[in-house]
Amino acid sequence: ADISAVDFNTVGTYTAVISVKDGSGNETREEVSVVVQDPSASLNSGSTVTVGTDFGSYSSEYVPFGFGSEVDENNRPTGLQWYINRYGKYTADFIQPESNYIYLTMDEGYEYGLTEGILDTLKEKNVKAVFFITLPYAKQNPELVQRMIDEGHVVGNHSVTHPSAGLSTLSVEQQINEVKEVNDYVLEHFGYQMYLFRFPTGAFSEQSLAIVQSQGYRSVFWSFAYKDWVVDEQPDVASSLANALNKVHGGAIYLLHAESTTNASMLADFIDGCRAKGFEFGYYSKVD
């Protein structure tokens, strides 16, 4: 067989030539396709991750995240389908399947004294959320992180430094470290294995998604967000609540920032309003 054209270090489809001689010495040659894939391993969740990956084979092109205002008949943003079609294979969620469940996620970069009250509200309303934390947050707020875990919330990985230009602007080694250092710290100090990752700013690349997947993580984006992260420019509570309720949809992934006084103020009414519309809050489990 002639396999000289096959590069076993690079993912792709190649052509090899196989030759066979019969008893009379007649030779038959045939071209066959050889597919080189990333080695993979199955997680307990049932998902598959790449291992020993040559991340250079993935596109590092910067991909911003945004999906516009168009919605379908069920109020679900139609702009998300573009991302699902292209990147969903990297165990990435942009929205959950249509159902009466919605998923509440909160990003924690810095603590502004609001998380304790948010946790109180969630406990009172019997809602489990996902809190995406950075490494500095975990180090500076161990009591809050422990409470999140103790009260049954999911603690997700939001990178070490929250690079403002996006994770994909870093080197492969730096990106791996941004995920791994948070993972290892939380596991060591809290005995908690994280399994969800949120990209800082939402920007990513195909390569970044593959890197996060290779670390055993599911990437979680969102189907609702609004400008709530500027601490000194908080939006009006009433209009923000109306906006959040008007855009509710089955399978929604809500992104709220925990440093927002508006979010802290409207959270209880938001939960009640969603339930009044027939929705319930789901738990973001490891199962795909």
Kindly label every feature range from the protein language model.
Residues 1-32:
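Serine/threonine-rich, repeat-prone extracellular segments and beta-strand-based repeat modules
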Residues 4-8, 197-202:
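A glycine-rich, coil/turn loop motif that links secondary-structure elements
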Residues 35-43:
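Extracellular interdomain linker/stem segments of modular secreted and single-pass surface proteins
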Residues 56, 62-167, 175-188, 192-194, ...:
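Active-site beta->alpha N-cap acidic-glycine motif
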Residues 114-117, 163-190, 203-250, 262-269:
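Alpha-helical scaffold elements lining the catalytic groove of polysaccharide deacetylases
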Residues 247-285:
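Catalytic grooves of carbohydrate-active enzymes
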